[in-house]
Amino acid sequence: MRKQSGFTVIELIITILVLASAGVIFLVQKNNLSAGHRDTQRKTAINAIYYNLEEIVYPKLGGYPATLDAKQLKAMDSELLKDPNGTAIGESGSDYSYEPSSCNGDICEHYVLRASLEREAAFERKSRN
Protein backbone atom coordinates (compact mmCIF):
# COMPACT_ATOMS: atom_id res chain seq x y z
CA MET A 1 0.00 0.00 0.00
CA ARG A 2 1.08 3.50 -0.81
CA LYS A 3 0.75 6.17 1.82
CA GLN A 4 -1.23 9.18 0.59
CA SER A 5 0.14 12.63 1.28
CA GLY A 6 -2.06 15.47 2.55
CA PHE A 7 -3.88 16.61 5.64
CA THR A 8 -6.40 14.66 7.62
CA VAL A 9 -9.86 16.06 8.25
CA ILE A 10 -9.02 16.61 11.92
CA GLU A 11 -5.90 18.62 11.05
CA LEU A 12 -7.94 20.83 8.71
CA ILE A 13 -10.65 21.39 11.33
CA ILE A 14 -8.09 22.33 13.99
CA THR A 15 -6.37 24.76 11.59
CA ILE A 16 -9.70 26.40 10.70
CA LEU A 17 -10.64 26.74 14.38
CA VAL A 18 -7.29 28.33 15.25
CA LEU A 19 -7.59 30.83 12.37
CA ALA A 20 -11.21 31.65 13.26
CA SER A 21 -10.25 32.24 16.91
CA ALA A 22 -7.41 34.54 15.87
CA GLY A 23 -9.81 36.47 13.61
CA VAL A 24 -12.35 36.94 16.40
CA ILE A 25 -9.66 38.14 18.82
CA PHE A 26 -8.38 40.59 16.18
CA LEU A 27 -11.86 42.04 15.55
CA VAL A 28 -12.61 42.45 19.27
CA GLN A 29 -9.30 44.25 19.85
CA LYS A 30 -9.84 46.47 16.80
CA ASN A 31 -13.30 47.47 18.05
CA ASN A 32 -11.92 48.23 21.52
CA LEU A 33 -9.16 50.41 20.06
CA SER A 34 -11.61 52.24 17.80
CA ALA A 35 -13.99 52.95 20.70
CA GLY A 36 -11.08 54.19 22.81
CA HIS A 37 -9.98 56.49 20.00
CA ARG A 38 -13.49 57.95 19.63
CA ASP A 39 -13.66 58.50 23.41
CA THR A 40 -10.34 60.35 23.26
CA GLN A 41 -11.72 62.55 20.46
CA ARG A 42 -14.76 63.34 22.60
CA LYS A 43 -12.64 64.29 25.62
CA THR A 44 -10.38 66.47 23.49
CA ALA A 45 -13.37 68.32 22.04
CA ILE A 46 -14.97 68.89 25.46
CA ASN A 47 -11.67 70.20 26.84
CA ALA A 48 -11.25 72.55 23.85
CA ILE A 49 -14.77 73.92 24.34
CA TYR A 50 -14.20 74.23 28.10
CA TYR A 51 -10.95 76.21 27.79
CA ASN A 52 -12.43 78.41 25.07
CA LEU A 53 -15.38 79.24 27.32
CA GLU A 54 -13.20 79.89 30.37
CA GLU A 55 -10.27 81.76 28.80
CA ILE A 56 -11.95 83.72 26.00
CA VAL A 57 -15.74 83.87 26.31
CA TYR A 58 -16.09 84.41 30.09
CA PRO A 59 -13.67 87.37 30.32
CA LYS A 60 -15.30 88.98 27.28
CA LEU A 61 -18.97 88.49 28.29
CA GLY A 62 -18.64 88.33 32.07
CA GLY A 63 -20.56 85.05 31.90
CA TYR A 64 -21.31 82.12 29.65
CA PRO A 65 -23.59 82.00 26.60
CA ALA A 66 -27.06 80.47 26.90
CA THR A 67 -26.43 78.44 23.73
CA LEU A 68 -23.26 77.23 22.06
CA ASP A 69 -22.33 77.57 18.43
CA ALA A 70 -19.30 78.48 16.33
CA LYS A 71 -20.10 82.22 16.61
CA GLN A 72 -19.34 82.27 20.35
CA LEU A 73 -16.32 79.97 20.10
CA LYS A 74 -14.28 81.65 17.38
CA ALA A 75 -10.88 80.69 18.84
CA MET A 76 -11.34 76.99 18.12
CA ASP A 77 -12.04 74.75 15.15
CA SER A 78 -15.82 74.61 14.66
CA GLU A 79 -15.53 70.90 13.78
CA LEU A 80 -14.84 70.23 17.47
CA LEU A 81 -18.47 71.15 18.15
CA LYS A 82 -19.46 67.94 16.33
CA ASP A 83 -19.18 64.50 17.87
CA PRO A 84 -17.38 61.66 16.02
CA ASN A 85 -20.69 60.84 14.31
CA GLY A 86 -20.92 64.39 12.90
CA THR A 87 -23.81 65.55 15.13
CA ALA A 88 -23.35 69.07 16.51
CA ILE A 89 -23.60 69.93 20.19
CA GLY A 90 -27.19 70.69 21.14
CA GLU A 91 -28.70 68.64 18.31
CA SER A 92 -30.83 65.60 19.03
CA GLY A 93 -28.70 62.47 19.32
CA SER A 94 -25.41 64.31 19.90
CA ASP A 95 -22.83 62.75 22.21
CA TYR A 96 -22.14 66.28 23.52
CA SER A 97 -24.34 68.43 25.71
CA TYR A 98 -24.06 71.98 27.05
CA GLU A 99 -26.28 72.73 30.04
CA PRO A 100 -26.19 76.37 31.16
CA SER A 101 -27.73 77.42 34.48
CA SER A 102 -28.56 80.61 36.39
CA CYS A 103 -29.23 82.48 33.17
CA ASN A 104 -30.27 86.10 32.87
CA GLY A 105 -31.21 86.56 29.23
CA ASP A 106 -28.37 85.36 27.02
CA ILE A 107 -25.74 85.34 29.79
CA CYS A 108 -25.45 82.47 32.27
CA GLU A 109 -23.45 82.08 35.47
CA HIS A 110 -22.66 78.37 35.26
CA TYR A 111 -22.69 75.42 32.86
CA VAL A 112 -21.92 71.73 32.55
CA LEU A 113 -20.33 70.27 29.42
CA ARG A 114 -20.84 66.54 29.01
CA ALA A 115 -19.74 63.89 26.52
CA SER A 116 -21.23 60.40 26.44
CA LEU A 117 -18.40 57.87 26.13
CA GLU A 118 -18.47 54.31 24.83
CA ARG A 119 -15.97 52.70 27.20
CA GLU A 120 -16.31 54.86 30.33
CA ALA A 121 -18.79 56.92 32.31
CA ALA A 122 -19.76 60.31 30.89
CA PHE A 123 -16.97 62.91 30.78
CA GLU A 124 -17.96 66.23 32.42
CA ARG A 125 -16.45 69.67 32.75
CA LYS A 126 -18.14 72.29 34.96
CA SER A 127 -17.68 76.04 34.83
CA ARG A 128 -14.92 77.43 37.03
CA ASN A 129 -16.83 80.49 38.16
Q: Whereabouts are the PLM-identified features?
A:
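A generic fold-level signal
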Residues: 4, 41, 105-108
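Short, surface-exposed beta-strand/loop micro-motifs that present aromatic residues
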Residues: 90-105
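Short, surface-exposed interaction loops/tails
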Residues: 103-129
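Membrane-proximal N-terminal amphipathic helix
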Residues: 34-62
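N-terminal "domain-start" segment
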Residues: 22, 26-36, 51-55, 69
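Short, glycine/small-hydrophobic-rich surface segments
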Residues: 53-85, 129
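N-terminal single-pass transmembrane signal-anchor helix
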Residues: 2-30
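Residue-level detector of conserved, well-ordered beta-strand and adjacent loop positions
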Residues: 65, 99, 114
